[in-house]
Swiss-Prot record:
Subcellular localization(s) per the UniProt record: Cytoplasm
Source organism, top-level taxon: Bacteria
GO CC terms in record: cytosol
NCBIfam families named in the record: PRK00110.1, PRK12378.1, YebC/PmpR family DNA-binding transcriptional regulator
Pfam family, one: Transcrip_reg
Native organism: Photobacterium profundum (strain SS9)
Keywords on record: Cytoplasm, DNA-binding, Transcription, Transcription regulation
GO MF terms held by the record: DNA binding
One Gene Ontology term from the biological process aspect of the record: regulation of DNA-templated transcription
Major subcellular site: cytoplasm
Recorded family membership: Belongs to the TACO1 family.
Protein name, entry field: Probable transcriptional regulatory protein PBPRA1113
Length: 247
């Protein structure tokens, strides 16, 4: 399926966030610890842990660091007592925003999230206000130049839902969360090395942004991601390459 990658629009800012790598690693380690506590230390039997490990590897985390995080979770590390909370809201141009947090104090967390929305021209919504606009999926991304037919055969035979070839030739493979590990393993075995792999929220509809609204959304995302309790920020804002180049 040809088209402009929904996933690329969600993640288009990641390359500019190297300065935040320490904070990103902290959040990845936290997810591994909690996933281990909730589902056990064996990634093959724990889809959440498998997804967390693959995401950590995509962000160049070492196996030693990952293994230490798993051991902390299996040993009852205090961070494993955190709970996952998702807040929903609206950004500029009616963009839908989902904020995934891990917290031991909901009052502190919601206060920070609400403040970030209000300072950036958005609004914190109620439960269910925008989550229907997102689907939870595994997304495995590949650079351009690969044999799409061979990849499609391997992906679909292993349970992939869809394959999307983007305008730049890169490829995104979509899976259900439960099939994510099996599809990733099959594509690895077929010789395809991914550039990113994670279970994420993919928007089913998009909100087009212009030169006025795109910077406002980016400021909102930055404000949210700077909060220690925030793990991930998802949105359905669509920023074209032409707009992105002018930001």
């Amino acid at each position: 399926m040809a088209g402009h990658s929904k996933f690329a629009n969600i993640k288009h800012r990641k390359a500019a966030q190297d300065s935040k790598r320490g904070k990103i690693f902290t959040k990845l380690i936290r997810e591994i610890i909690v996933a281990t506590k909730d589902g056990g230390p064996e990634a093959e039997n724990n889809p959440r842990l498998r997804a967390a490990v693959d995401k950590a590897l995509s962000n160049n985390m070492t196996r030693d660091t990952i293994n230490r995080a798993v051991k902390r979770g299996a040993g009852g590390d205090g961070e494993a007592d955190l709970e996952t909370v998702i807040y929903e809201g609206y950004g500029p141009a009616g963009t839908a925003v989902m904020v995934e947090c891990m917290t031991d104090n909901r009052n502190r967390t919601v206060s920070g999230v609400r403040n970030a929305f209000s300072k950036s021209g958005g609004n914190l919504g109620t439960d269910g206000s925008v989550n229907y606009l997102f689907d939870k999926k595994g997304v495995i991304s590949y650079a351009a130049g690969l044999d799409e037919d061979v990849m499609m055969e391997a992906a679909l035979e292993s349970g992939a839902e869809d394959i999307e070839t983007n305008d730049d030739g890169s490829i995104d493979v979509y899976t259900t969360p439960s099939d994510f590990g099996a599809v990733k393993d099959a594509l690895d075995a077929a010789g395809f090395d991914s550039v990113n792999a994670e279970v994420t929220l993919v928007p089913s509809t998009k909100a087009d942004l212009d030169l006025e609204t795109a910077p406002k959304l980016l400021r909102l995302i930055d404000a949210l991601e700077d909060l220690d309790d925030v793990q991930e920020v998802y949105h359905n804002g669509e920023i074209t390459d032409e707009i992105a180049e002018q930001l």
